[in-house]
Amino acid sequence: MASAAFEIDILLPSDLSPADLSALQKCEGKLVFLTALRRRVMLSSVTLSSYYVNGAPPDTLSLMAAFRRRFPAIIQRVLPNKMIAAALGVAPLPPGAFIQNTGPFDLCNGDSVCALPPILDVEDKLRLGSVGEEILFPLTVPLAQARELIARLVARAVQALTPNAQAQRGAEVMFYNGRKYNVTPDLRHRDAVNGVARSLVLNMIFAMNEGSLVLLSLIPNLLTLGTQDGFVNAIIQMGSATREVGQLVHQQPVPQPQDGARRFCVYDALMSWISVASRLGDVVGGKPLVRICTFEGQATISRGEKAPVIQTLL
């Protein structure tokens, strides 16, 4: 017999107004991310203020990292005193589990769905004025489109750093399921979208630059293995750019170990770069949470509609 679903009671404040409660009831099927996996939690554990770091609001990269670190759950029911959410990844989903499409793309039967912060002009934020809280719901996006969307955003942000850069025709258009979507982020003003793109680009450029410098410092040492390693010898004989770099750029020899047993600095730098690049890839790569599974009815779910889901097999 299958184990029961892990349901979480998100307790609502007693002074929540009827209007705010009615707005919350329209959020059934949306995703929230919990700071801790408990049977009963407070509303403050899923509000926007829970993502703040040292009192500063989060940018998109920190939200992506939080989505990977926290525990995802789907709001199944909203009652006068609590919201009942089903946790993902710890137990089977309850029968009839569903999600609400909050992203810009249509969801199709069989799509693996991941969560993204609002990186475009599409934002799903609910303000509860009676208790002074805000809930920022993530965008539900198919996995392939989420990765392409992040790649396009980073490419546009890099292009915007070039003075007098002109956007290429069709660079901000995505096609999915027979429809055309305009994915134009506003990179001209220092608003939330601009800050998001800049933080993402700076982290990526830093990782690529550090990795290139570390590998460049190792090239002369690698080329000395040409007489012993057939693969390296083949690269040298090809007269490639790698060979030119090894001949023209004379790096300083690797220093002796510091403090006795300490490792070489260049290898420490390489290790740190691999760690940073791997972590950045995990954050921006997207993680499938659920999979759309419709047995009857329409196979395409538009924004604001609900769709039955099953757990992903990843």
From Swiss-Prot:
The lineage of its organism: Viruses, Duplodnaviria, Heunggongvirae, Peploviricota, Herviviricetes. It is found in: Virion; Host nucleus. This is Triplex capsid protein 2. Keywords: Capsid protein, Host nucleus, Virion. Belongs to the herpesviridae TRX2 protein family. It comes from Equine herpesvirus 1 (strain Ab4p). GO terms for molecular function: structural molecule activity. The keyword Amino-acid biosynthesis does not apply. The gene is TRX2. It comes from the Viruses. Disulfide bonds: none annotated. HAMAP family: HSV_TRX2. Structural component of the T=16 icosahedral capsid. The capsid is composed of pentamers and hexamers of major capsid protein/MCP, which are linked together by heterotrimers called triplexes. These triplexes are formed by a single molecule of triplex protein 1/TRX1 and two copies of triplex protein 2/TRX2. Additionally, TRX1 is required for efficient transport of TRX2 to the nucleus, which is the site of capsid assembly. Interacts with TRX1 and major capisd protein/MCP. GO terms for cellular component: host cell nucleus; viral capsid.
